[in-house]
Amino acid sequence: MSDRAMPRILLAEDDDSLRGFLARALERAGYEVTACADGDEAAAVLDQDWDLLLTDIVMPGLDGIEVARQAAARHPGLRIMFITGFAAVALAAGESAPAGSKVLSKPIHLREIVHEVDRMIAA
């Protein structure tokens, strides 16, 4: 984790409502969140300093796995978490997530996501 007081999370989620709920829940938990509507938007800010990438897998433009690969290449050791309703399908289709990443399946409670983010940031 960086030396900043608030860990920074890059959130990529194409569902507007879910993206808003996640961003607010994580901000209330003490995180600085940059929320992106798709993989292309997230890829455009990958050069910034992030503590965790929280991304959907199936999105318009770049999918979450490709965003995660690019993020991991630029930031070795970056914590990566996928939230998706298509985890089994997306990851079984020959796609491989970066080592050490975590996959959470939708539907999922916001509390559970915040708890998992807390655990990954603390690790």
Predicted regions mapped to residue ranges:
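Active-site residues of response regulator receiver
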Residues: 56
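Charged docking surfaces used in two-component/phosphorelay signaling
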Residues: 17-28
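Acidic catalytic/metal-coordinating carboxylates
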Residues: 38, 63-67
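Receiver (REC) domain active-site loop signature in two-component systems and cognate sites
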Residues: 59-60
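Non-catalytic signal-transmission and effector/linker regions of two-component phosphorelay proteins
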Residues: 1-10, 77, 111-123
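Conserved acidic carboxylate
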Residues: 13
